[in-house]
Design a protein with these regions (language model features):
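Surface-exposed binding/hinge segments that line
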Residues: 109, 142-188, 207-212
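Ligand/substrate-recognition segments at binding pockets and active sites
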Residues: 381-458
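Ligand-site clamp/hinge motif
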Residues: 196, 228-284, 414-415, 428-430
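Extracellular/periplasmic solute-recognition and catalytic clefts
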Residues: 134, 211-221, 252-312, 335, ...
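Gly/Pro-rich hinge or "lid" segments in bacterial periplasmic/extracellular proteins
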Residues: 176-252, 260, 368-373, 560-566
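Alpha-helical secondary-structure segments
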Residues: 49, 123-130, 161-163, 206-207, ...
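N-terminal lobe/hinge region of extracytoplasmic solute-binding protein
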Residues: 51-101, 132, 203
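Detector for C-terminal structural segments
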Residues: 15-28, 302, 327-359, 367, ...
Length: 566
């Protein structure tokens, strides 16, 4: 029996004693005619108000991109699987799954009774429709890569079979992608999917349904059959110190135009939580009475991408790459640019990941003198206050690409710090500042850059194959650095192959050891997703997340309470 169970039991026993005592002490009533029953008012729903910066133009997962859109969809829609505690993946719309011995074929069985929010049962055909919709030739939305290289087949009403072009071990994680209702969308031509009423009146199979949407945000109501995973964490704080809390029956996602407006709303008591704010505002709000900070480690790495394509010779010598990393004060980046809300990165694998191996990753300390020695080892020589590369007369000046401060203030600030650190060892930097789309399409994809400060989402499984495989190095591929290594290719392929996690952990350690030797990308830091919540909100539990919407992984265990005596 839990502590809360004991509290409830003791309260019930005390109430029973009072009732029995009253029955013994009171004389029999003179009139046995029953008095009219007094109607019991329906209690007001417990409402959790979550503040988010951004706007809402669509809630169709095929096209949702803004932070409010993605957060709402995380509550309205479900995938076959969902995140569990301690890095696990647990069933959601699926009740179970199995894989062939080579990991090429996966069969998922849908949960009997799973239904859309309009009451129609969820079937295997819904899954097949979703996969095919994201693979349509004319689809260019955010889920375009969700089911890439996957063929889906409905075996029967509840069973769906996936065949993978390339077997991978993390397929259950990929199966978290939201499933769409075929009975509402299958007859809509692909070109028209982005213009239906479904965009603003979605029907999902998630734990909350949309009941109202306007310019101020969305109102979501908990489905009556929504239940947390058996593996979900228990709620706190100690119920002896709090009144018995209630489930969150309604979530109001309130949207604000900028960080300042959201921070003001939190200070005014208009929202119960605020996430994704600047480090300064986050630290200010979390210091308010009755507020606390919940930090979710993320899979998004802030790094320096170096152009290692053939014909671009500046960084081909590994001593140069090591010198550039030695020169960067990554601890200062975490302290200053991230406001302490992050961790230094020593490898491309998040420190909170099951795949992280500190011994294999090693650690490159901030050391300007050692950086200069590495440049000398690469054949560079001093020229006044700068450096000259072998075979080149002019001193080295590096281009550093970054997005503008409005688009990504953190990356811009980090780029300024990196430039200052490199200048301190005699390497001046020329900034190229662009919007996000232009930086990617005009610079990173065609390889028209020297170095770039970028955010890389390595994913919950830390599959680094798309990021570094030689097969992805040609222009248009996902290996934007252009780094190619037969040795690393072999290690990456082995690490992503279907195998027990203990085997994969050893293989990932080999990958990290090779990355520490080659340094194809310079890891800087992982920023946390910082979530400021009021102490009346019980339950948000940190775990490694890929997207801020993943913070709702345990939302069905969250509670609202008021301090005892209030």
């Amino acid at each position: 029996m839990t502590r809360r169970d004991r509290t409830v039991a003791l309260a019930a026993m005390a109430l029973l004693v009072v009732i029995v005592g009253a029955m013994v002490a009171l004389p029999p009533p003179a009139d046995t005619t029953a008095a009219p029953a007094t109607p019991v008012p329906t209690p007001a729903p417990r409402i959790f108000r979550d503040g988010v910066v951004g706007s809402i133009s669509t809630l169709d997962p095929l096209f949702a991109r803004t932070r409010p859109e993605l957060d709402i969809d995380a509550l309205v829609f479900s995938g076959l699987t969902r995140l569990g505690p301690d890095g696990t993946v647990v069933p959601d719309l699926a009740s179970s799954w199995s894989a062939s011995s080579d990991g090429r074929t996966w069969t998922f069985r849908l949960r009997p009774g799973a239904a859309w929010q309009d009451g129609i049962p969820v079937t295997a055909q819904d899954v097949v429709f979703t996969v095919q919709a994201t693979q349509a030739a004319d689809y260019r939305g955010p889920l375009a890569g969700a089911w890439q290289g996957v063929t889906a087949q409905a075996v029967d009403r509840l069973d769906v079979r996936f065949t993978l072009a390339t077997p991978v071990a993390d397929f259950p994680l990929a199966a978290r992608s939201p499933i769409l209702p075929a009975h509402l969308l299958a007859d809509v031509p692909g070109a028209n999917l982005g213009g239906t009423s479904f965009e603003l009146a979605p029907v999902g199979a998630g734990p909350y349904r949309l009941v109202r949407l306007d310019a101020t945000g969305a109102v979501l109501e908990r489905m009556s059959d929504a239940a947390p995973s058996p593996a979900a964490p228990s709620v706190g704080p100690d119920p002896l110190l709090w009144q018995l809390p209630d489930d969150i029956q309604q979530i109001d996602v309130r949207v604000y135009p900028d960080d300042a407006a959201l921070a003001a709303a939190f200070q005014a008591g208009q929202v119960d939580a605020a996430g994704g704010l600047s480090p300064d505002l986050t630290n200010q709000l979390s210091a308010l009475p009755g507020a606390r900070l919940v930090r979710y480690p993320r899979t998004v790495l802030t790094a320096v991408m170096l152009n290692l394509r053939f014909g671009h010779n500046v960084f081909q010598n590994v001593h140069v790459r090591r010198a550039l990393l030695l020169a960067i004060d990554r601890n200062a980046i975490v302290r200053q640019q991230m406001g302490g809300l992050g961790v230094r990165a020593d490898t491309l694998v998040p420190p909170s990941s099951w795949a992280f191996n500190a011994q294999a990753a090693g650690s490159v300390a901030y050391d300007r003198a050692a950086a200069a020695k590495e440049l000398v080892a690469a054949g560079w020589r001093r020229s006044g206050s700068g450096w000259v590369r072998p075979g080149v007369k002019a001193p080295v000046t590096l281009e550093l690409l970054t997005v503008d401060a409005t688009t990504n203030p953190l990356d811009y600030a980090v780029a300024v710090q990196v430039a200052a650190d490199w200048k301190a060892i005699g390497i001046p930097v020329r900034f190229t500042v662009l919007g996000a789309d232009q930086a990617v399409n005009d610079k990173l994809v065609p390889g028209n850059y020297d170095a770039a400060v970028v955010d890389l989402n390595v994913g919950l499984d830390a599959d680094l194959y798309p990021l570094l495989a030689s097969a992805q190095a040609p222009v248009g591929g996902s290996n934007l650095s252009g780094f190619q290594s037969v040795t690393l290719d072999r290690l990456l392929e082995a690490a992503r192959a279907y195998a027990p996690q203990s085997t994969r952990a050893r293989r990932m350690a080999a990958v990290e050891a090779d990355l520490a030797k080659e340094l194809p990308i310079l890891p800087l830091a992982y920023a946390d997703y910082a979530y400021v919540v009021r102490n009346t909100v019980q339950g948000p539990t940190p775990r490694l997340i890929s997207d801020p919407g993943d913070r709702y992984w345990d939302v069905l265990t969250w509670r609202l309470a008021t301090a005892a005596g209030q």
